């Protein structure tokens, strides 16, 4: 057993002069791999990996997605799907050069926007993502549905989501809405303090009293001072756009794009892994209706509901990890 519980960003050289940033902790020689894909305005950060995960003899890998942080954007004329599957194949092949996509046990997970690349990997053709044959489980936390096929996706959106990533933003030419949002956000400031203020206004200050008390208990149980979580998220937010805003600018096009498959048409082999979807009952960013659509169209799937809004999944993570990895000792 080769345990490495010290996090720190690492860099993998990719073809065409690109770079993939990632962090990894746990048993680096384990053939059980947990690949976690982050959401928007974030990076691959394993510094707060759950001790419960580390006790399960798992190699925990958190890459930074294309166009965010220190990971290069997709090359010109390369689709997001092809870039993602190529990057993740290179990353896993780097750690498991002799596996040829056959002899590891792979769990893939994502939260919020990270559920989109997670689903792309889940349904990807095996010639594009050979490690797809190794997938044992898929975890989608605060999931997005594929807007291309979920015709009612916009009905449960907030006005801000409807404008930025919904029909308004998507159908405006030249990604003008994304450019406008980027302009507004950069005008508000790009320091850690600016990001922390924005996070408080848009996430933490919108908690009701019950969720605020749950959050405070969660911090206390983990020995975190009040404000520490917000500060950490703000630091990663700033890092995520420190090199470019390409990751953000790709969000709306990717949400509306062809992910390479229809959820209701996945073949039997792709549908083999169990899929766990978690949905927060009062989440307005990724409404439960998205989880309902996915559950109705994927096979071998189950939904786990939790109380609270978009942030509330944070408080149930250990419970979710344990349920998702119940077969791992």
Task: Give the label of every model feature segment.
Residues 39-52, 73-74:
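The serine-hydrolase catalytic nucleophile loop
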Residues 53-74:
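Conserved alpha/beta-hydrolase
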Residues 83-106, 120:
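Conserved acidic catalytic loop of the alpha/beta-hydrolase fold
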Residues 105-152:
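Conserved hydrolase catalytic core segment
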Residues 153-264:
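Alpha/beta-hydrolase
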Residues 248, 284-290:
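Conserved alpha/beta-hydrolase "acid-adjacent" motif
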Residues 270-271, 276-279, 283:
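Short beta-strand/loop motif that positions the catalytic acidic residue
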Residues 292-329:
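Catalytic active-site module of serine/aspartate enzymes centered on a nucleophile-bearing elbow/loop
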């Amino acid at each position: 057993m080769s345990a490495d519980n010290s996090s720190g960003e690492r860099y993998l050289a990719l073809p065409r002069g690109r770079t993939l940033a990632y962090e990894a902790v746990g048993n680096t020689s384990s053939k059980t791999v947990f690949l976690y894909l982050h959401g928007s305005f974030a990076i691959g950060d394993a510094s707060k990996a759950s001790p419960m995960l580390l006790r399960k003899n798992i190699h925990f890998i958190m890459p930074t997605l294309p166009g965010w942080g220190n990971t290069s954007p997709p090359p010109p004329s390369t689709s997001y799907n092809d870039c993602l599957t190529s990057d993740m194949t290179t990353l896993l092949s780097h750690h498991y050069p002799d596996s040829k996509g056959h002899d590891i046990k792979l769990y893939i997970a994502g939260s919020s926007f990270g559920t989109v690349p997670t689903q792309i990997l889940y349904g990807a053709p095996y010639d594009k993502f050979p490690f797809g044959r190794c997938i044992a489980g898929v975890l989608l936390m605060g999931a997005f549905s594929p807007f291309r096929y979920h015709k009612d996706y916009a009905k449960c959106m907030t006005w801000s989501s409807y404008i930025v990533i919904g029909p308004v933003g998507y159908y405006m030419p030249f990604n003008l809405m994304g450019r406008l949002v980027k302009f507004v956000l950069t005008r508000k400031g790009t320091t850690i303090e600016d990001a922390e203020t924005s996070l408080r206004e848009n996430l933490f200050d919108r908690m009701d009293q019950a969720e605020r008390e749950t959050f405070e208990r969660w911090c206390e149980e983990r020995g975190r001072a009040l404000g520490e979580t917000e500060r950490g998220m703000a630091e990663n937010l700033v890092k995520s756009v420190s090199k470019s805003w390409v990751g953000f600018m790709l969000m709306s096009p990717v949400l509306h794009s062809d992910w390479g498959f229809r959820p209701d048409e996945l073949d039997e082999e792709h549908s083999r892994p169990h899929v766990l979807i978690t949905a927060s009952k009062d989440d307005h960013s990724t409404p439960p209706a998205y989880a309902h659509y996915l559950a109705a169209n994927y096979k071998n799937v189950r939904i786990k509901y939790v109380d609270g809004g978009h942030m509330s999944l944070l408080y149930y993570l250990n419970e979710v990890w344990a349920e998702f990895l119940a077969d791992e000792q």
